[in-house]
Amino acid sequence: MPPEVMTVADDEVVVFHGPLATTWTDLPPDTELDLDGIEVRTLPRRGELLATVTTANDVHFGETVCGHIDGVDWETYAVAPGEAPYPETMNAAVVADMAARRPDAVVVKGDVTADGTDEQIDRFLEVYGGEFGDRLTWVRGNHESYHHQQRGAWPVQERTLDGVVLAVLDTSRDATINGHLSAEQLDWLDELGARADRPVLVFGHHPVWNPAEERRREGVFGLVPGDTEALVDVFARRPRLVGYFAGHTHRNNRVDLPGAGDVPFVEVGTVKDYPGSWAEYRVFDGLVLQVHRRVTAPAALDWSERTRGMFAGTYARYARGRLSDRCFAMEAR
């Protein structure tokens, strides 16, 4: 198995060989390096670190089987009798890894449950809220809204930290899998972009519609086309908005859309299976880094490796994405 460069920061690189990780720390920023034959460039840094934000999505408390797709006879994955449910294993590992970074804020952007039940949401809040308290901001995803769950259905949320503002949007619609933004939400984001005195990171569950991947129709997987275009218009008009960060697809991906300049529209992979993804945002003066991270606990890595073969062996490449999808720098506009 070839090495997988999972994390590149301004001072750190983590390379996995299957479940085994090699970590280099105290590296110089913005520098081409040869690390045991692996060529990589660290991300830039600008001044002192102002804030750290972590994010996760698609944590799926209550799920018991993964890899199932209706109408497709592919292998599915479940834990053995007596083993802890895999969402418990994976989320405990992610929470521990996040806590070690001492984040100023944590954003969980949807699909916190498998079935949208109150019991599953309570368990999510026990695990994430129990560790992070009032540093936690969360919003529902389609796994909640499909079942008409209204907890987490705040249309907009705003949080201000040193060097950055966090804007969180509820993109989910009741009884519907794909995403939507109302005129009121877009107006609010436009107004926030106009008054913000620092970079704004925008979070939601559903990724943008990408015309390079899907034809124009209302049944797209992510945000419907008209709302995607309206969101792009707001970003184009408000340079304080530096990026949009979503989940939903269970992959790491970055999309550049016409009319949005160099604004990244990002998808962060799922917590619950391979590779066990979450992301860290390092905020500097006029510069924000997205640093992808993979779970580190042995039990979580074991489950992650077991599930890399999902979808007839196609899942690992899809879910992992490119290094440039996972780790990159965003200049304040």
Question: Which residue ranges define each predicted feature?
Answer:
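Extracellular ectodomain segments of secreted/surface proteins
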Residues: 1-20
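A short C-terminal boundary segment appended to hydrolase-like catalytic domains
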Residues: 15-16, 285-333
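N-terminal active-site segment of His-dependent metallophosphoesterases
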Residues: 26-117
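Beta-strand-turn-beta hairpins that frame and shape the catalytic cleft
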Residues: 43-54, 62-68, 158-168, 195-201, ...
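Extended active-site neighborhood of metal-dependent phosphoesterases/phosphodiesterases
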Residues: 45, 118-194, 222-231, 240, ...
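Acidic/histidine-rich helix-loop elements
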Residues: 57-89, 146-152, 174-181, 215-220, ...
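Active-site environment of divalent metal-dependent phosphoester hydrolases
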Residues: 62-65, 114-119, 143-149, 174-177, ...
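His/acidic metal-ligating clusters that form di-metal
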Residues: 94-105, 176-264, 314-333
